[in-house]
């Protein structure tokens, strides 16, 4: 073999080695991802089962808080359809207990409003319930002022609604000078006005509630923010998630030490994830220590998301995934 032939032979061998090297790199990436998936699955998402879609059939029962015409009622219809079997309960806690007892397959709860912020106490209830967030829905909130047939805007003295409803319409209410009375639910206020038949009373609720309870809309869309929207979550006893889910909600506790939250946020930033919400809640019996509830855009099928969750778990206390949806 002359010198030129030997050079060509070496170049061919080098190219074969480069090709083989790239194949091994690709395999290592896949194996590394699989190892990470296995690690996080055993340590953090133990028990979670991926599904193609949530099971919903003619026997499925959904529970919501309030009465027909409430925004939770509307969110239920939006997510499950109008033909879904349903029950309604008086309190948010009752939604959780109804699902835990097996009397309902899914529960609907409001979690956050774009104008008034988080709905107080919901994350605490969900985090300690053992239930899983398996879905979510956003409902455009168009509050109406409604009274009994024949009443006029000038007759109104007292307005009933959920505290969030009153807060979201505070500018209109304060200008008008009405007495404001909180009730358990926006639609509950509509029921009260209908039942008492007093022309000086009005409710703030949805157009659906006005239609259901035969009330007249005295003034429409009275919210402070025309883009007012409420985010709802869907709860289940089953620890499952739809494979196409793109949001993950987690909770964890942090000690009262410098840099602890910064460290958590660093793991999110390092993995290129977007945090869409965060709420802190004081820990009972632990002065100046807090639990945090955060929602990330991510997937349990994604190595970057898995890496972030793994590190958050290691750097926090009582870490728990409360849902991916």
Predicted feature residues:
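Domain-level signature for soluble enzymes in the chorismate/prephenate branch of the shikimate pathway
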Residues: 1-325
């Amino acid at each position: 073999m002359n010198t030129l032939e030997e050079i060509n032979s070496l170049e061919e061998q080098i190219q074969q080695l480069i090709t083989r090297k790239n194949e091994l790199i690709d395999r290592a990436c896949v194996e590394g991802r699989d190892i990470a998936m296995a690690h996080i699955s055993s340590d953090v998402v133990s028990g979670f089962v991926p599904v193609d879609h949530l099971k919903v059939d003619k026997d499925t029962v959904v529970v919501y808080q309030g009465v027909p015409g409430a925004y939770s009622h509307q969110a239920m219809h939006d997510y499950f359809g109008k033909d879904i079997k349903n029950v309604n309960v008086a309190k948010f806690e009752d939604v959780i207990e109804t699902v835990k007892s097996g009397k309902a397959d899914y529960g609907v709860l409001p979690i956050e409003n774009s104008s008034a912020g988080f709905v107080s106490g919901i994350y605490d209830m969900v985090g300690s319930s053992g239930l899983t967030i398996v879905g979510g829905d956003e409902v455009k909130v168009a509050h109406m002022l409604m009274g009994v047939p024949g009443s006029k805007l000038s007759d109104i003295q007292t307005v009933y609604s959920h505290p969030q409803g009153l807060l979201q319409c505070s500018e209109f209410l304060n200008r008008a000078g009405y007495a404001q009375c909180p009730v358990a639910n926006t639609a509950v206020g509509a029921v009260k006005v209908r039942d008492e038949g007093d022309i000086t009373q009005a409710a703030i609720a949805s157009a659906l509630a006005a239609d259901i309870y035969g009330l007249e809309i005295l003034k429409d869309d009275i919210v402070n923010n025309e883009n007012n929207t409420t985010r709802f979550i869907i709860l289940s006893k089953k620890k499952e998630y739809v494979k196409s889910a793109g949001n993950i909600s987690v909770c964890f506790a942090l000690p009262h030490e410098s840099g602890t939250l910064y460290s958590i946020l660093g793991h999110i930033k390092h993995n290129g994830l977007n945090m869409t919400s965060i709420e802190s809640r004081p820990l009972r019996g632990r002065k100046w220590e807090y639990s945090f509830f955060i929602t990330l855009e991510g997937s349990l099928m994604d190595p970057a998301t898995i890496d972030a969750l793994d590190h958050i778990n290691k750097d926090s206390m009582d870490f728990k995934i409360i849902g991916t949806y």
